[in-house]
Amino acid sequence: MSDANLRARIRMSTVYTVANNLGYLVVGTDNAAEIHTGYFTKYGDGGVDLVPLANLTKREVYEWAKALGIHEDIINKAPSAGLWEGQTDEIEMGTTYDMIDAVVEGRLEEVPNKDKEIIERLHRISEHKRHTAAAPPKF
C-alpha cells in the first residue's frame, strides 16, 4: 500500500508542478463516497485546490456523466485508482459504491450489516484524512 500511496503523491507533485507553471489550480475528482470512506491518498489525489464533486455520491457522478454525454466506455469502466494492474476500488474496499452511497444518503436500512461494518471501519480509520494537520495551541 505504501508504494501505491507514493505513486499517488508523485503523480500529484507532477500535476502541481504543471499547474504552478501555468498559473492553474488543481481540481480533484473525489466524490462523497470516496471522502466518507477515506478512499484517497492523503497529500496524493486528496491534495487539491478544489473538489467540485465532494457533495455528489458516486451514483450522482454517473448520472452527471450520462447527462454530459460522457462515452459509455468510460462510465462503465470499473472505478480504479490505476495504481497497479487489475486493481479496482470496490475489490480493494470490500464493499460497493452502491452500499457506500446508501450510507452517505442515510438509507441505512438498505445496507447489509457486513457492508455497514466495512464502511464504518473505513470511515473511522480515515478520519485523519478529512482534517488539516493538527497544530499545538498558541501560548
Can you annotate each of these PLM segments?
Residues 1-9, 13-16, 20-25, 29-139:
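ATP/NTP-dependent adenylation/nucleotidyl-transfer catalytic domains that generate, transfer
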